[in-house]
């Protein structure tokens, strides 16, 4: 009987530790390209579940890919994706025109120095908006743990 109580206590403690490790945040992005202005890099790296509302663009997706080191779940169901043209988006090392309401090319896939591509392996789930028209080239390439 004592062993059973000890095992239950250990299991309960493990569940509590796992639950406390999850960090969920919700942000409203008023202007496309300004997501990172809403938090510090340390705060971004702690987030495991992120809900975004408002307006995003390819610059925001680059930050989601490169700076949210523990991001597992991303909910953008109540966000719109604005058109962006420039070199600061997700496409590696070139000027690119990112259409509105499309998941940008290479959104969660980064080109490394040796020209290989690495996906965001922490990402397990993404909830898209009904307004999403298209998923551009290699947006989720290499995201091995992403479930549909």
State the predicted function of each range.
Residues 106-107, 136-141:
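Consensus positions within tandem repeat domains that build extended binding/scaffold surfaces
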Residues 34-43, 59-66, 137-139:
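Short, T/G/N/S-enriched strand-turn elements that build extracellular solenoid repeat scaffolds
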Residues 23-31, 48-56, 71-86, 90-102, ...:
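Structural signature of tandem-repeat unit edges
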Residues 1-24:
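Bacterial Sec-dependent N-terminal signal peptides
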Residues 67-70, 110:
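Structured segments of extracytoplasmic/periplasmic soluble domains
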